[in-house]
Swiss-Prot record:
A Pfam family the protein falls into: CxxCxxCC
HAMAP family: UPF0260
Protein name from the UniProt record: UPF0260 protein plu2141
Protein source organism: Photorhabdus laumondii subsp. laumondii (strain DSM 15139 / CIP 105565 / TT01)
Family assignment from sequence similarity: Belongs to the UPF0260 family.
Length: 143
C-alpha cells in the first residue's frame, strides 16, 4: 500500500489539489488579527471574517473571496514561511516544520468531525464581524 501524498512529497511537489486538501478547514486563518503599531506584535481575535460561515468553518465565497474581502490572505507554497502566526495545528505549518499531520486531521480521519470534537475549529469561539463594536474586547490568545 502506498503512503499518503503528504508523507512522500514536499509542499513544493504537491499539486494544487493536494495543497488545498491539506487545509483542515478549522477557520483559524479567517479570524481577524490586530497588530500593535508600536511593537508589530500580532493579537488574535475571535472575530470571524464576514465571509466565514461559523457553523461550517468554510468560506461562503471561497473562489471569489478576494472580491469580497480584499485583505484576505492567500496562503501559497511561496509565502508560507512568512506566516509565523499560523496555528501550531495547521497542516501547512506542521509539514513545513517536518512534523506529521495530527491524528484528528480530516485527511487521516476522513471527516472534519474529529477536528470539531477536539475544539480545533473556531466554531465554538468565533463571533460575527458585523456584531463587533470594540475589536480589542475580542482579543484572545493564539487559537
Amino acid at each position: 500500500m502506498s503512503q499518503p501524498f503528504w508523507q512522500v512529497k514536499t509542499l513544493d511537489q504537491m499539486t494544487d489539489e493536494e495543497w488545498e486538501s491539506l487545509c483542515d478547514g478549522c477557520g483559524q486563518c479567517c479570524l481577524h488579527k490586530l497588530m500593535d503599531d508600536d511593537t508589530d506584535e500580532i493579537y488574535f481575535t475571535n472575530v470571524a471574517c464576514n465571509q466565514l460561515n461559523i457553523k461550517t468553518c468554510q468560506c461562503k465565497n471561497y473562489e471569489d473571496r478576494f472580491r469580497y474581502e480584499p485583505d484576505c490572505i492567500k496562503l501559497t507554497r511561496y509565502n508560507l514561511p512568512t506566516f509565523a502566526w499560523l496555528p501550531i495545528t495547521c497542516a501547512y505549518r506542521l509539514l513545513e516544520e517536518g512534523k506529521p499531520l495530527l491524528p484528528w486531521h480530516p485527511l487521516i480521519k476522513g471527516s472534519k468531525s474529529a477536528m470539531h470534537s477536539e475544539r480545533i475549529s473556531v466554531r465554538h469561539i468565533a463571533v460575527r464581524e458585523i456584531d463587533v463594536v470594540e475589536w480589542e474586547d475580542h482579543i484572545i490568545n493564539k487559537p
